[in-house]
């Protein structure tokens, strides 16, 4: 019986919120609001605009370090295993390789905007 009451309350609240969401919005559509947002670029111009290679390099660097975080997230669970030294060695090697890559990119001036 309690499960039925909880289900009934949840369905009624969800239905109520959906109905309120349909009644509340103000429909003031004007031309600027109807146009899609194009991140500061003119949406009527060509879609094949050239962009700086610096943005690409920063994006690739971000993806690499994001991948590093994704690989290191399971580390607390891996430490609970019996072979802690192998886990820590693997993590240290991964972080060292990424740090050397970052140092190389820094020395090659890949992270600087002005040249």
UniProtKB/Swiss-Prot annotation:
Alphabetic keyword roster: Electron transport, Membrane, Mitochondrion, Mitochondrion inner membrane, NAD, Respiratory chain, Translocase, Transmembrane, Transmembrane helix, Transport, Ubiquinone
EC number(s) stated in the UniProt entry for this protein: 7.1.1.2
GO BP terms, alphabetized: mitochondrial electron transport, NADH to ubiquinone
Localization, UniProt: Mitochondrion inner membrane
Catalytic activity field: a ubiquinone + NADH + 5 H(+)(in) = a ubiquinol + NAD(+) + 4 H(+)(out)
InterPro entries, sorted: NADH_UbQ/plastoQ_OxRdtase_su3, NDAH_ubi_oxred_su3_sf
Keyword Cytoplasm: no
GO cellular component terms listed in the entry, alphabetical order: mitochondrial inner membrane; NADH dehydrogenase complex
Chief location category: mitochondrion
Broad enzyme group: translocase
Membrane disposition: Multi-pass membrane protein
Transmembrane portions of the chain: 4-24, 55-75, 87-107
GO molecular function: NADH dehydrogenase (ubiquinone) activity
Quaternary organization: Core subunit of respiratory chain NADH dehydrogenase (Complex I) which is composed of 45 different subunits. Interacts with TMEM186. Interacts with TMEM242.
Protein family membership: Belongs to the complex I subunit 3 family.
Chain's role: Core subunit of the mitochondrial membrane respiratory chain NADH dehydrogenase (Complex I) which catalyzes electron transfer from NADH through the respiratory chain, using ubiquinone as an electron acceptor. Essential for the catalytic activity of complex I.
Protein name: NADH-ubiquinone oxidoreductase chain 3
Species whose genome carries this gene: Reithrodontomys megalotis
Encoding gene per record: MT-ND3
